[in-house]
From Swiss-Prot:
The lineage of its organism: Bacteria, Pseudomonadati, Spirochaetota, Spirochaetia, Leptospirales. Pfam families: CinA, MoCF_biosynth. It comes from Leptospira interrogans serogroup Icterohaemorrhagiae serovar copenhageni (strain Fiocruz L1-130). SUPFAM superfamilies: CinA-like (SSF142433), Molybdenum cofactor biosynthesis proteins (SSF53218). Belongs to the CinA family. HAMAP family: CinA_B (MF_00226_B). This is CinA-like protein. InterPro entries: CinA, CinA-like_C, CinA_C, Competence-induced_CinA, MoaB/Mog-like_dom_sf, MoaB/Mog_dom. It comes from the Bacteria.
């Protein structure tokens, strides 16, 4: 079997109207890249059954024996009248729909748990628990609606998943990716990635990519995605040694600024070393705490946070000295240091992250411009580290840059002490 031409389709009028962003397609494309597949095309369609049907027919016609097509579609599997995916796929295949036994059991349990009568809502529920006849079912372990895979000809398959990101990601990782790997043989591909902190895509391409013969010659497929505070660099090749060489070179050139996925690795470190953490946040307004608590099991290491937006909270709860605030200001290295040390005491933790800055658009001065931010990394019975950064971006972007940087700074300190 040849490697397929993969096309991702996202459905939803909220996407085509601009009311919501399509994050599913980029997530799926990244996951596929990690298992050795590349995406040829991304398509966004409204909740219009005729438009969806026409697009699918066009894409099906592209398939040949040497160029099989895999279509991956998200959205349109819900209970409402504008969820058309099941209807369209059944029409395209000329088959009826059947209930998924597993999905019916899940929805009955769902209604029972909430004291609702399943029979009274049967017609609505049926839309969510049905799949095309003779399809491969992708079970939904997070929500209700199952996904499914159907053959649309000898050389083309269509996989459909819910549009809800949490349901889709679990379904793809647990079931769909396994099916793809079994169905399509690929050359053995090796991949790896790094986060490079405080680096732009263009700067990285100029400094690194343009000078690497293995990349410019096409021996290695590379990709870079800009995030708030870092870029994610990935390499893929059928030669493991080439990927390892490039990753090692990144680590040598960029040192501690070259990391694995900090947001995955930091929780592992905290759990492994049985370390507890707390936060003292001003300009980020609790965003660092959110990043910690987004991870399942974070209660084992994250004790809590203080949102010290007002100076009175900095003084009253964190113990920042009045003279410090008066002499140096709320946005200062000195205040960040005392915030971090106060969080250690107030929360009874081993480590703390503090952040204070000017998110804008107002509040800046010639001496302290909008975008200036200070961090403190506190450690019980040890000297507190302080860091200064400057993120001259819109308010929401500034907050994300600052929050991500705070997580990185704690990770970096723990790695240095390991």
């Amino acid at each position: 079997m040849f490697s397929p031409k993969i096309i991702i389709l996202s459905t939803g009028s909220e996407l085509t109207s601009g009311r919501s962003q399509d994050t599913n397609s980029s997530w799926i494309a990244n996951e596929l890249f990690g298992i050795g597949f590349t995406v040829s095309k991304l398509v966004v369609l409204p909740d219009d059954p005729e438009a969806i049907l026409e697009e699918l027919r066009t894409l099906v016609s592209l398939a040949t024996k040497k160029n099989p097509v895999l279509l991956i579609m998200t959205g349109g599997l819900g209970p409402t009248e504008d969820d058309y995916t099941l209807e369209v796929v059944c029409k395209l295949k000329g088959v009826s729909s059947v209930e998924s036994v597993v999905a019916r059991q899940r929805i009955e349990a769902f209604y029972k748990l909430r004291g609702k009568n399943f029979q009274e809502s049967l017609q609505t529920a049926i839309r969510q628990i049905s799949v095309p006849k003779d399809s491969t079912i992708l079970n939904n372990e997070v929500g209700i609606a199952p996904g499914f895979i159907v053959s649309l000809g000898e050389n083309v398959h269509l996989g459909c998943m819910p549009g809800v990101p949490g349901e889709m990601t679990e379904m793809f990782r647990e079931e769909f990716s396994t099916w793809i790997l079994k169905k399509y043989s690929t050359r053995e591909l090796h991949s790896g990635f790094r986060f490079i902190w405080w680096m732009s895509e263009s700067q990285f391409q100029k400094e690194f990519i343009s000078k690497e013969e293995s990349v410019t010659s096409g021996k290695v497929i590379w990709g870079v995605a800009a995030k708030r505070g870092y870029i994610r660099v990935s390499f893929q090749s059928n030669e493991r040694a080439l990927v390892d060489f490039l990753l090692k070179k990144l680590d040598e050139i960029y040192g501690p600024k070259s990391t694995l996925d900090v947001f995955e690795e930091l929780p592992k470190l905290l759990i492994e070393k049985k370390i507890t953490v707390g936060t003292a946040e001003s300009c980020t307004g609790g965003l660092i705490s959110k990043i910690f608590t987004d991870k399942p099991g974070s209660s084992t290491y994250f004790y809590g946070g203080v949102i010290s937006y007002d100076n009175g909270v900095k003084e009253g709860i964190l113990g920042v000295k009045k003279n410090t605030l008066k002499e140096f200001g709320a946005v200062s290295m000195e205040t960040a240091k005392e915030m971090a040390e106060g969080a250690l005491v107030a929360l009874g933790v081993d480590y703390s992250i503090s952040v204070t800055g000017i998110a804008g658009p107002g509040g800046g001065t010639p001496q302290k411009k909008v975008g200036l931010v200070y961090f403190g990394i506190g450690q019980k019975n040890e000297k507190t580290e302080t860091h200064e950064h400057y993120f001259p971006f819109p308010r929401s972007s500034f907050r994300e840059f600052a929050a991500h940087t705070g997580i990185y700074l704690l990770y970096n300190r723990l790695k240095r002490l390991a």
